[in-house]
């Protein structure tokens, strides 16, 4: 069915049937959309985020639709919490086939490089870079024990160019691109594929917060997107689902734009 934004809700095809997939940042936005989509595509999903209530609602929804879902508490700024979340997946299912490292935090104060606070930089480093480094290593360790797997990291269109409005956010996302590509090369021999996606403007709570801090940003993003609209979270999740699936078996080390042409 085509909705008012001209997006298409495709019928599931079993893209992830039989796979166990961890999703971070799963309580809202792209992560919540991925939880629903991956489960419909046949994956057993483990959802991780700080908001236990939001995760519980999504788990209930997925199970009501006949899917397999569990939740685990996760604080991306806490390395022990990140490792514990990955360990919990192995406890629940005995393996980990795919990981969608999607959790992130927006920059508290959008603005020029010279006004970005130390606190903002520290938070961006801990959540948008170090957490992924920690998660990827923990995930790869489990995957090696079971013959391999696939990892997808959510970066941003803002990582691909100068970003005066969100300098700390963009810098950490660009660093994430680097370790994504490095992990792809380093772990290929273990049967682990590692890719990233770089979404453009997407209709999420993070964009809502940015709009509140900088009125007019949604209109500017929309105007700069050749397809003429913001992405829906599910559209970003669709790209991640394909990269996690066996249909992307020869794809590793890629940073895939999902931006409506804005980065072209």
Predicted stretch roles:
Residues 20, 27-29:
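Conserved glycine-rich cofactor-binding loop
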Residues 114-134, 148, 152, 176, ...:
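Catalytic Tyr-X3-Lys loop
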Residues 141, 185-189, 249:
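Alpha-helical segment proximal to the catalytic Tyr-Lys
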Residues 133, 229-258, 263:
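C-terminal substrate-recognition "lid" of short-chain dehydrogenase/reductases
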Residues 136, 172, 180:
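Active-site helix of classical SDR
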Residues 83, 106-122, 145, 165-168, ...:
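Conserved mid-core segment of classical short-chain dehydrogenase/reductases
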Residues 156:
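Residue(s) in the substrate-gating loop at a strand-loop-helix junction
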Residues 53, 73-85, 118:
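The beta1-alpha1 cofactor-binding region of Rossmann-like NAD(H)/NADP(H)-dependent oxidoreductases
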């Amino acid at each position: 069915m085509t909705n008012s934004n001209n997006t298409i809700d495709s019928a599931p095809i079993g893209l992830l049937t039989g796979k166990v997939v961890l999703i971070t940042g799963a309580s809202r936005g792209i992560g919540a959309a991925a939880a629903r989509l991956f489960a419909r595509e046949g994956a057993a999903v483990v959802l991780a985020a700080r908001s236990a209530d939001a995760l519980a609602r999504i788990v209930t929804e997925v199970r009501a639709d006949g899917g397999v879902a569990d939740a685990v508490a996760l604080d991306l700024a806490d390395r022990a919490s990140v490792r514990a979340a990955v360990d919990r997946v192995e406890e629940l299912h005995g393996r980990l086939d795919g990981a969608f490292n999607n959790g992130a935090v927006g920059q508290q104060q959008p603005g020029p490089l010279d006004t970005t606070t130390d606190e903002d930089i520290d938070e961006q480093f801990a959540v948008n870079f170090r957490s992924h480094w920690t998660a990827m290593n923990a995930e790869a360790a489990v995957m090696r024990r079971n013959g391999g797997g696939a990892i997808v990291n959510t970066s941003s269109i803002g990582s691909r160019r100068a970003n005066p409005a969100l300098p700390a956010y963009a810098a950490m996302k660009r660093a994430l691109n680097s370790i994504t590509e490095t992990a792809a090369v380093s772990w290929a021999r273990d049967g682990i594929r590692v890719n990233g996606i770089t979404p453009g403007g997407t209709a999420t709570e993070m964009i809502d917060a940015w709009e509140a801090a900088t009125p007019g940003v949604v209109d500017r993003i929309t105007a700069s997107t050749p397809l003429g609209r913001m992405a829906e979270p599910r559209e970003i999740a669709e790209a991640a689902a394909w990269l996690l699936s066996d249909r992307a078996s020869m794809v590793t080390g890629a940073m895939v734009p999902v931006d409506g042409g804005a980065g072209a």
